[in-house]
Amino acid sequence: MRTTQFFLSTTKEAPSEAELVSHKLMLRAGLIKRLGSGLYTWMPLGLRVLRRVEAVVREEMNRAGAIELLMPAVQPAELWQETGRWAQFGPQMLKIKDRHEREFCFGPTHEEVITDLARREIKSYRQLPLNFYQIQTKFRDEIRPRFGVMRAREFLMKDAYSFHASRESLAATYQAMYDAYGRIFTRLGLRFRAVAADTGAIGGSASHEFHVLADSGEDLIAYCPDSDYAANVELAEALAPAAARGAPQEAMREVETPKQTTCEDVAALLGIPLARTVKLIAVMAGERMVVVLLRGDHMLNEVKLAKIEGLADFRLANEAEIRAVFDCPPGFLGPVGIDRSTIRVIADRAVAVMSDFVCGANKPKFHLAGVNFGRDLQEPDLVADIRNVVAGDPSPDGKGTLALCRGIEVGHVFQLGNKYSQAMNATYLDEAGKAQAMEMGCYGIGVSRIVAAAVEQNHDGKGIVWPASMAPFSVVIVAIGYGKSASVKNAADTLYADLMAVGVEVLLDDRDERPGVMFADAELVGIPHRVTLGERGLNEGVVEYQPRRAAPEQGADARKIAVAEAKAFLMGVLGD
């Protein structure tokens, strides 16, 4: 492709509303153009990247035994009403009516459509298992679309759905898809982690998320550098401390804390570690108050708390409810002296082994020090893991300690079980001729989101640094003075034709532009290999080669390559 025949639309500055690096660079490089809130046109350069990602995804899905189809983007309301999600999905679903006033939605996902297809077409256990996938445009009416295509309203997604006669069969396909996802992200040249995740609203028994590691990621991941363990912080287990509770060494006493309403302030006033303080969080489970105790340096994990019996729909108590029970404002609350006949006390594992700790006195402007379970207050009603892990915690797999990093979710796999098949009566006849609900799996990849995540992970001060497998072109030939020098034109055309003949994706920059502009565009767009041809170099019989991503030992200096050896040299580096 020649730039004079291509649509290259680069800019020096990104719009002020662009926040993430990927959003700024994708706009500046001309990969995308904004149409409206959360709506983007994929420009020719960006579409080339998107199609390369799509090709890798398609190859690995086919390799894993999935069968491609394409379902309608617009879906009838009746299917969603069968599962109850027409009302549950909320305002993210774009609902529309046709000329006959029949209701439809622009599909945010396709569980209902594929389950309807399965119940129509699958009759016998002999037809199972089956695994279908599509690469399809989705629409979710985000309340605040942002970050470019990272969180757009319209996006491209690969979604796959598998159907099974047994949970064992589902588990086998789940593992095959898990492995396929690993191959996809490895082939795309991305640093990623597969993490155990919460099944959330989709439901099911097992779930893993795939995260591209980037400082800008919205999700916090706990992982062990010494093993394969990784989990979303929502699910990462905080093990019980190895040490048992120590014997009391202090008498309980009141300490005046006139302006100190947080554990941090109290610890600073008393000159003690924050880990020696205990904070109380009051929550409501229906009409009953439940008290949650955490170490002062730990944070409540609401996902874990909601999994405790009776707390699935808990909410934080408001100030009026707190004052009605404690006769004390928030900031001075503690577990000593509360009515245990009406208030349930749940303590985190780390709190349960504490002695001589500091907590609120249930008295304005006072805290208690030297507090001990068994002596000054009853043992908790329940001890459970209800906190977020922190860096340095023991890894749940026993193979080291945890570290934390941020990630961008680009893939998610679920074992759905029979949630949708039961709701929609998707059954098959087993060997005994009895109708059984199919077991289902669901496997999604954000194809367009991968592009943005890759930019977040692969950029420098000059622009994008594409992994080779995602780059819109493999080689850019910068022909300085192409329209003015016959020798430059002939050499550039020859190298361009030679590379094209062997299947190399090459961009020939034959514009009448200043060299600085051509170099800046090549670096901004992020093409992995650049060859520069100029009259002076050709007079010496050389061209200049510059990799976009130089290996540390090579440095960033350009190399001079003999004109006659340019093709062979490039084929060598492209094969590395």
Swiss-Prot record:
Lineage summary: Bacteria, Pseudomonadati, Pseudomonadota, Betaproteobacteria, Nitrosomonadales
Pfam families in UniProt: HGTP_anticodon, tRNA-synt_2b, tRNA_edit
Binding partners and assembly: Homodimer.
Keyword check for rRNA processing: no
Function: Catalyzes the attachment of proline to tRNA(Pro) in a two-step reaction: proline is first activated by ATP to form Pro-AMP and then transferred to the acceptor end of tRNA(Pro). As ProRS can inadvertently accommodate and process non-cognate amino acids such as alanine and cysteine, to avoid such errors it has two additional distinct editing activities against alanine. One activity is designated as 'pretransfer' editing and involves the tRNA(Pro)-independent hydrolysis of activated Ala-AMP.
GO biological-process terms attached to the record: prolyl-tRNA aminoacylation
Coiled-coil ranges per UniProt: none
Alphabetized Gene3D superfamilies for the sequence: Anticodon-binding domain, Bira Bifunctional Protein, Domain 2, YbaK/aminoacyl-tRNA synthetase-associated domain
Disulphide-bonded residues: none
Entry-linked PANTHER family: MITOCHONDRIAL RIBOSOME PROTEIN L39/PROLYL-TRNA LIGASE FAMILY MEMBER, PROLINE--TRNA LIGASE
GN (gene name): proS
HAMAP family documented for this protein: Pro_tRNA_synth_type1 (MF_01569)
GO MF annotation, one: ATP binding
Official protein name in the record: Proline--tRNA ligase
Catalysed reactions, semicolon-separated: tRNA(Pro) + L-proline + ATP = L-prolyl-tRNA(Pro) + AMP + diphosphate
